[in-house]
Amino acid sequence: MTLRLSRTTTLAGAGLTAAALLLTACGGGSTTADPAPDNVAPVAPAASGAPAAASDINYEGTLREPATTARAAAKDKKVVIISAGQASISSSVPVAAAKEAAEAAGWQTDVYDVQLNPANAPGLVRQAIAAGADGIILQAVDCPGVKGPLQEAKAKGIEVVGIYSFDCSDPIFEGNDPPLFSGQINYGADAAEIGKFTEKYGADQAKAVIAATGGKAKVIFFNSPTVTVLNYTGKGFKDEIEKCAECEIVAEVEFAGSELGPNLQQKATSALLQHPEANAVKSPYTSATLLGIAPAVVQSGRASKLYVMGGEGFAPELDLLRAGQGVNAVNIAPSDWTGWAAVDTMNSLFAGTPAQDSGLGWQLVDKDNNLTSNGPFVPKTDFKAIYKKAWGV
């Protein structure tokens, strides 16, 4: 039975503040895994047909090199990056990367800050238009909340690309509005657009949970449903859990971004008390892990009996993983790489050519696999060098 601890609110507009607290934020072939982290019960043999073997954990990941096709950087362009909230690491990291990439391409670049207040977003889009922007990159700002200004931008021929942002035509908004984004990051043939990409990301998180619990996952699932991208990652996760005959989501805990901290920790504590049968926890994003879920897991005294799938895997969450403090694994889709991919997409739009494969995917990280000794995750691919060479800069 699903336990809901708060009520879902509308997706459009209201989710921007919480969206700024996260990235998403995805399925490749199986690979033989190293031993599971030592604070997780050993994986039991899987029943025939059950996706529960340790070899089903995709430690190889799905990151690959971006397309190397030559695509010269456009000349004399001005780009405005609109951040959902620079006070949040989930916004500041990809935005800084996009700014770095745009400047490497030789473009004049400005960053506007919505400051975690959705009411500021329409005015900032109009400010970018008035400033003579050739392109606008929206970070965690969905189309419905800025529909009017985007229509104005489109009328002026301004190119628009999103970073973890969803167009007005996205099915999740349940309308028939035409798209207002000029293009989107190319996530590859298997997940060409962000909805499919993020569903697959969530599915791989679930596969790791299923394998770590021997095909008998009993999951407390946390989500912030006003955030569009989390509905996609959540769907991918839950759909994969449903394929497992002996797995179940025993509690679904919904929360708003404003509840991060003591309120979320209390919800997590209550869910853990109400579900002693739970052996797994799913966090939707890093801030939720840090500001509620991981502390509740540690204080429950059950950390050694729970497999906790964390969020995006920013450096503070990796520190918890290294210390065994309420996080067992994270699935990382590198946000700095995403910022560069957004600029590459913008460059293709300026040239009137299709967006090239970004190479973006994700990397599962746990205590024994793919974890650096300290600091943030560093992908093996030097994506910056590849993009610069392709742009001729």
Model-derived segments and their meaning:
Residues 115-180, 286-293:
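Beta-alpha junction/loop-to-helix N-cap segments that form part of ligand/metal-binding clefts
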